[in-house]
Regions:
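Helical scaffold of the NTase/Pol beta-like nucleotidyltransferase catalytic core
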Residues: 1-43, 158, 164-182
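Catalytic cores of NTP-dependent nucleotidyl/adenyl transfer enzymes across multiple folds
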Residues: 4-5, 111-182
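Generic detection of long, well-ordered alpha-helical segments
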Residues: 12-16, 63, 67, 147-154
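Short, acidic/polar N-cap/turn motifs at the starts of alpha helices
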Residues: 23, 100-102, 130
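Active-site nucleotide-donor binding segment shared across nucleotidyl transfer reactions
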Residues: 23-61, 66-68, 72-74
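Short, solvent-exposed polar/charged micro-motifs at secondary-structure junctions
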Residues: 43-46, 95-102, 182
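Short amphipathic alpha-helices in soluble, non-transmembrane regions
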Residues: 73-81
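Conserved catalytic core of two-metal-ion nucleotidyltransferases
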Residues: 80-125
Length: 182
């Protein structure tokens, strides 16, 4: 579970290049993955929303990959110069089939940007379409914050909990990207 947010930092934005570089690889993976975590919340949010850091997490890209699509996903990542990165989780006994791939991009102003993709190999993930993207079904996604996701304090997560409690579909709801009043 994530630490409480520092409310003084609520107006901070994700750099546009981070969104751009992530979307570039996601487009090539679109037909063979299910988006999870921050990118699922991103596509549930209204179009052209402000990319507040506390609305949803764009530090990495969390994906679910059906076992039958793993080879294709790995080929796409390798063709796009992503490399396998070993993590401490690779050595731990787990039911999760987890893989991390990273790529470092040098921007025009010579800043290094790391794009990290965490993917979990699993079939039968409840999912739905949002703006042409396959995303983890929000009610199922909320349950992942107890084991594979950690940004449970983001506004999108907190808003979706409330919306689903009222049987309201979270798709395109402003609450997902609105700075909380309290």
């Amino acid at each position: 579970m994530g630490a409480p947010h520092n409310k003084k930092r609520y107006g901070e934005l994700w750099p546009s290049y981070r969104i751009q570089y992530a979307l570039e690889i996601l487009v090539s993976l679109k037909d063979v993955v299910i988006l999870s975590g921050g990118w699922a919340w991103h596509f549930l949010s209204p179009l052209n929303h402000t990319e507040y850091k506390h609305a949803h997490d764009h530090k990495d890209i969390d994906l679910f990959v059906d076992p039958k699509n793993v080879a294709e996903v790995m080929n796409i990542l390798l063709e796009n110069n992503f490399q396998k990165v070993w993590t401490r989780y690779d050595q731990l006994p787990s039911d999760e089939n987890f893989r991390r791939y990273e790529k470092t991009i040098l921007t025009e102003d010579e800043k290094s940007v790391r794009v990290t993709i965490d993917f979990f190999v699993k079939s039968n993930i409840p999912n739905r379409m949002a703006k042409g993207w396959s995303i983890v079904e929000p009610s199922y996604l909320l349950g992942l914050y107890s084991n594979i996701h950690s940004s449970d304090k983001c506004w999108a997560v907190q808003s979706v909990i409330k919306l689903l409690d009222q049987n309201i579909d979270p798709l395109d709801r402003e609450e997902l990207v609105t700075i909380p009043k309290n």
